């Protein structure tokens, strides 16, 4: 399995089905990736178990894997090492990450290299930008009150972080209801939707065959409640009937509300003055940059790969991290500069993103990457990614681009 990192999350339907296939067919398994571990030993343990079986450097018992994860994964409050202290003694290492690295690379069947495939260097620096007073004020109010500028109250920390990152880019998303449904109906719709999604999340934790994705669960609930004939399993969902009764009675759209497009204007300015790629995570932001700069926007959809690979490097482009930031080969032949306008917080996402230009076929001696880190949310995202990359390099031994790059803003 090439791109083994796509199978590292056991909670996805894809990985669940793949692991069931391996278990049912007793297949021999090989995999490789530069970002296999992500940010947890749990990301590689199940794949190692199928590939190496009793020779795996990780525990075969999932409960013990969880214990290792709590003690070894990057965390401000790791669990005590407990029995893992013996690994420090056995390897002669002083840090548990290094001890685990020795255990992994010395296990028969594991191939690890520290050699890079490209001689070009990487330079990462901050692109400074002045934050308008209106953005600073809006972000301060958001952090204090957990209320969006339009009065919407946020309910959890993940939602708060998402909105703060949007507002740092100058806007936020909201749902609108253009058909004018009554507020009481919209509220009932929200409650039914919330109950259904919560029940689905709980059910998915068990990852049962034919019940391992939201779509399959909806079909199983329909078979139970509506009596649809099938040999497939059913699911006696408590919330399904309430949800389907009201599901189609409310129509909503996402709308971007701009506070100040200062960051999009700055990214467009960079794109016009240089020849490179502006990477984005938020669709509204990417669209605004492309419009301001008068350059192509490369998102997803049918034909997306052909369209972006048809570029010849005679102009800057705006590209989606989700659609083109992983696995896309060919951009390195035409570009050596990039601006990460909405920086990811995942070390593995950065590894893949930097690898779009820093790879075999890059004719320049240096790949230059600029990134915004003008708010705590943006700075924390990059700092967290660097922390994860250091952990992955320490445990897995694979050189991480965030670690080998010259990161200017970290220089004292």
Regions found by a protein language model. Name each.
Residues 345-412:
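A conserved SF2-helicase RecA2
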Residues 118-135, 143-329, 400-412:
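Conserved Helicase C-terminal RecA-like lobe
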Residues 8-34, 39, 53-203, 273:
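Inter-lobe coupling linker of SF2 helicases/translocases
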Residues 43-61, 335-340:
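A short helix-turn-beta junction within AAA+ P-loop NTPase domains corresponding to the substrate/partner-engaging
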Residues 29, 276, 367-369:
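Hydrophobic/aromatic residues located in beta-strands of well-ordered beta-sheets
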Residues 2-3:
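Walker B catalytic acidic pair
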Residues 33-44, 280-288, 303-311, 315-365:
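SF2 helicase motor core recognition
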Residues 25, 292-293, 334-335:
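Short, structured coil segments at secondary-structure junctions
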